[in-house]
């Protein structure tokens, strides 16, 4: 383009020079003609023509100048356009470089973040492994402690069994035939229908022989109204077993042979000789927890049958739900030695008919209660076991026996707020007399507390006859207090001493005997 513009400019200059030469020649001619004396028409015409040529030359010069100007402007515009294109290319290249740099920086940052995440994951894995190792070490330590505790309990239980066997043998020799005769006439009858009365039992067993006495064991804390005689005074709900004492041993033996396994209503009764009163057979009642909610009485007996003769068994049912139990049961063996073997073999194990490990403990400890129950307390108060009863337990504030004072009934009015004092005061008048159950008052229970929790809480200390939680009829929740009746005073006292001041479900329990309040 620059070459063409240069050529065009040169051509214009040549044309201009030629025109100027022509004008000069014409001027010379005109001058010559002017000098001549004669002016003719040809000269005038030539002058006019020359003038036109000059004008044409000037116009040509202007055109050439315009062309040159246009060419210069076009060249300048082309140069500016080229410069702009170069600048745009430079800007684009710079933007591309910046974008590449940003991408590299982002990739580097992502790599750093990924490395940090990998490090965090590795640290978390190491922490989890360390935690698992610590948990394994703690579990191993707990297992060692539990094994040591079980060994101590087993040793003491074996000592108690040996001592009981020794005492039983010596006692049998001293009692002579009198003890044997009493044993061979007294029968225990299990699995009686709850609606069956003493008169009906007497009528049934008197068909075999002469009866000296009949006693149906009842729960005095639960009211029972005879549907056939609603006006009759209540004697308490039947516990499903009783005793029949014959005059002659042969009649008692005949009753066992004839009536054992008899079907009455929805029950199959079990008739056997009552156990003699000796140390060898005392305290053979076991408390069992952790049972499946759907376990039947037959399944429970099948677990314990290999260890000895079962006198009676019981599974606590949920109120208003016949298909669900409380997961708690009781097994009474014929001899304490049999119960001991069952504890050693089954406690902490998972039988085939269960899904979780079961807890098997003595429920009715004879004689020196502290010798057997005290070693069991650490295992019972183990947090893993306490979680099953709905709350943690801590060391009591005071382990003294002052709470057993007869003044405890009066102190309830001071300890309990508002209307609960009156309720507790009324409860103290319900304490049974000598020979009956020993009722215990428990205060500061959580609203969601159920009777099963108290069964499991007090069961390991001895035989629990009944449990009652006082509920608000509107909300059907616990009012904050309840009652537990135990059949043995030493066991009840041990339970109070261990549980008063303990915490269950973030609540400190107040546990004391119900006593007759002075009027």
UniProtKB/Swiss-Prot annotation:
Domain RRM: 185-276, 284-365, 438-516
Cystine bridges: none
Cellular component per GO, a single term: ribonucleoprotein complex
Pfam families: RRM_1
Signal peptide segment: none
InterPro entries, per database record: ELAD_HU_SF, Elav_RRM1, Hud_Sxl_RNA, Nucleotide-bd_a/b_plait_sf, RBD_domain_sf, RRM_dom
SMART domains: RRM
Keywords: Repeat, RNA-binding
MF (Gene Ontology): RNA binding
Family: Belongs to the RRM elav family.
Known role: Probably involved in the RNA metabolism of neurons.
Protein name: Protein elav
Annotated gene: elav
């Amino acid at each position: 383009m620059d070459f063409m513009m240069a050529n065009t400019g040169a051509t214009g200059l040549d044309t201009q020079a030629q025109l100027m030469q022509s004008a000069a020649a014409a001027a010379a001619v005109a001058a010559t003609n002017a000098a001549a004396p004669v002016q003719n028409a040809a000269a005038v015409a030539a002058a006019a023509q020359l003038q036109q040529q000059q004008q044409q030359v000037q116009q040509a010069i202007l055109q050439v100048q315009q062309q040159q100007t246009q060419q210069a402007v076009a060249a300048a515009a082309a140069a500016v356009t080229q410069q702009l294109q170069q600048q745009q290319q430079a800007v684009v290249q710079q933007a591309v470089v910046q974008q590449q740099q940003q991408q590299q920086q982002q990739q580097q940052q992502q790599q750093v973040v990924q490395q940090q995440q990998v490090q965090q994951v590795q640290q978390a894995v190491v922490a989890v492994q360390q935690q698992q190792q610590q948990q394994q070490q703690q579990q191993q330590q707990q297992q060692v402690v539990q094994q040591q505790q079980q060994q101590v309990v087993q040793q003491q239980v074996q000592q108690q069994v040996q001592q009981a066997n020794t005492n039983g043998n010596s006692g049998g020799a001293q009692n002579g035939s009198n003890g044997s005769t009493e044993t061979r006439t007294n029968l225990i009858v299990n699995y009686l229908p709850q609606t069956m009365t003493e008169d009906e039992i007497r009528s049934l067993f008197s068909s075999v022989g002469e009866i000296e006495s009949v006693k149906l064991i009842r729960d005095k804390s639960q009211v029972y109204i005879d549907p056939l005689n609603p006006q009759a005074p209540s004697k308490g709900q039947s516990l499903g077993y009783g005793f029949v004492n014959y005059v002659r041993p042969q009649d008692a033996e005949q009753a066992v042979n004839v009536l054992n396994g008899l079907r009455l209503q929805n029950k199959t009764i079990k008739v056997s000789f009552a156990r003699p009163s000796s140390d060898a057979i005392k305290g053979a009642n076991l408390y069992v927890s952790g049972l499946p909610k759907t376990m039947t009485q037959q399944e429970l007996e099948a677990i314990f049958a290999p260890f000895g003769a079962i006198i009676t068994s019981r599974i606590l049912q949920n109120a208003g739900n016949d298909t669900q139990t409380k997961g708690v049961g009781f097994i009474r063996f014929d001899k304490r030695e049999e119960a001991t073997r069952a504890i050693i073999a089954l406690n902490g194990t998972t039988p085939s008919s269960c899904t979780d490990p079961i807890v098997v403990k003595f429920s009715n400890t004879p004689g020196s209660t502290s010798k057997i129950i005290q070693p069991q307390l650490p295992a019972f108060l183990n947090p893993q076991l306490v979680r099953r009863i709905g709350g943690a337990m801590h060391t009591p504030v005071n382990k003294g026996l002052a709470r057993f004072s007869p003044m405890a009934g009066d102190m309830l009015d001071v300890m309990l707020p508002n209307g609960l004092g009156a309720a507790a005061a009324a409860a103290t008048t319900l304490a049974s007399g000598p020979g009956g159950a020993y009722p215990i008052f428990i205060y500061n229970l959580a609203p969601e507390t159920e009777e099963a929790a108290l069964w499991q809480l007090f069961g390991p200390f001895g035989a629990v006859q009944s449990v009652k939680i006082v509920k608000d009829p509107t909300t059907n929740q616990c009012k904050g207090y309840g009652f537990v009746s135990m059949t043995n005073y030493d066991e009840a006292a041990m339970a109070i001493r261990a549980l008063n001041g303990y915490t269950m479900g973030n609540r400190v329990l107040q546990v004391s005997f119900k006593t007759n309040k002075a009027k």
